[in-house]
């Protein structure tokens, strides 16, 4: 057991290109914001350790590229994820309409009980908003997914989004039978996964 943390959670940020996934990650992990937009090539990740209910939780947050051409690369990163934050841009209707497609990706590649959170980013751009809070909330409620509107630019609800996801995963892990207290060890039907047999060896 690593004494530095009690839990290690892998989180994914997914959604269309340009919705602000990298900005959300930068705001949460480094409390910084970049106005200039640089498209993420492939996958990038950051780590932040948080305290919750007296437990130290290490969050490994992966920023997956939104472009269609990277879909095959990022599909492997769904595996092993504890939580997935599906992000859209409140000023871009297409990015919201594509949320269904991203949820299909989750159903296809992620584990069955993975935690999900719907996030509408760029809520500071009120005059340009085209996806109403009510529409998004109704959509999320229909699917049984928590929903928050965020702004990476002014930090609105960014901390809340990641901490809510962390709490939900922690609750789920605690309610699971055997092995719940040792999250760094992934168990599949009671068998520890061999750390040596990586899928990247080919």
UniProtKB/Swiss-Prot annotation:
It holds the Pfam family Ras. GTP binds at residues 15-23, 33-40, 63-67, 121-124, 151-153. Residues 192-202 have a biased composition (Polar residues). PROSITE patterns: RAB. It is a lipid-anchor. InterPro entries: P-loop_NTPase, Rab, Small_GTP-bd, Small_GTPase. A motif (Effector region) lies at residues 37-45. GO terms for molecular function: GTP binding; GTPase activity. Its main location: membrane. GO terms for biological process: pollen development; pollen tube growth; protein transport; vesicle-mediated transport. Belongs to the small GTPase superfamily. Rab family. Protein transport. Regulator of membrane traffic from the Golgi apparatus towards the endoplasmic reticulum (ER). This is Ras-related protein RABD2c. It comes from Arabidopsis thaliana.
């Amino acid at each position: 057991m690593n004494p530095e943390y009690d839990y290690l959670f892998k989180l994914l940020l997914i959604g269309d290109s340009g919705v602000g996934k990298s900005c959300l990650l930068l705001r949460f992990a480094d409390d910084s914001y970049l106005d200039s937009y640089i498209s993420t090539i492939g996958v990038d990740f950051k780590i932040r350790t948080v305290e919750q209910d007296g437990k130290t939780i290490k969050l490994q947050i992966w920023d997956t590229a939104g472009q269609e051409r990277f879909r095959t690369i990022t599909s492997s990163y769904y595996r092993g994820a504890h939580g997935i934050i599906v992000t859209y841009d409140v000023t871009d209707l297409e990015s919201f309409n594509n949320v269904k497609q991203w949820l299909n990706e989750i159903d296809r590649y992620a584990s069955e009980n993975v935690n999900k959170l719907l996030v509408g980013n760029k809520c500071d751009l009120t005059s340009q908003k085209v996806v109403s809070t009510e529409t998004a909330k109704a959509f999320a409620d229909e699917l049984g997914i928590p929903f928050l509107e965020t702004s990476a630019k002014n930090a609105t609800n960014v901390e809340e989004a990641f901490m809510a996801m962390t709490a939900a995963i922690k609750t789920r892990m605690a309610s699971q039978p055997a092995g719940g207290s040792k999250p760094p060890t992934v168990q599949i039907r009671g068998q520890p996964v061999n750390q040596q047999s990586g899928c990247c060896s080919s």
